[in-house]
Amino acid sequence: MPSFDIVSEIDMQEVRNAVDNANREISTRFDFRGVQASFELNEKSESIKVSSESDFQVKQLVDILREKLLKRGIEGGALEVPEQIEHSGKSWIVDAKMKKGIETDIAKKLVKLIKDSKLKVQSQIQGDEVRVTGKSRDDLQGAMALVRKGELGQPFQFKNFRD
């Protein structure tokens, strides 16, 4: 029976490249000239520390980071930015986390979305991924299109497509 897995993975090398590109851009931008602004990648905790001298500049920096991530092939939904901006001395800091893996509640929504579509496929949760099986390849491709359209707040990739 044909099947595929729905996963949510991030290539940390591409994240590192995007952070380097963003740091390079803020060093050449006129509106950040003479301002202590930076991006710091922590690969162990899979987070990016965005810091600047004012809160609106932090928001601009997050937009720059999202743009650079998108150019490197990482969707903006993979970056989880808290609403609260920390203020410490004369710097404003946001610790943005990268979403990796499918959480249980999102996996349940994904399974429900596929079941409610009346497609002739079965879906099951396997750890941090969802396996979808069906009798025909066309049904599986319909399920892929459905998942791409479904706004679940997280980017998904499809792998292990087997006939």
Swiss-Prot record:
Q: Which residues form the signal peptide?
A: none
Per UniProt, which keywords does this protein have?
Nucleotide-binding
Q: Which GO terms describe its molecular function?
A: nucleotide binding
Q: CDD domains in the record, alphabetically? A: YajQ_like
Q: Which Gene3D superfamilies match?
A: 3.30.70.860, YajQ-like, domain 2 (3.30.70.990)
The protein's job, in short, is: Nucleotide-binding protein.
Per the record, the similarity remark reads: Belongs to the YajQ family.
Q: What is this protein's name?
A: Nucleotide-binding protein ETA_25210
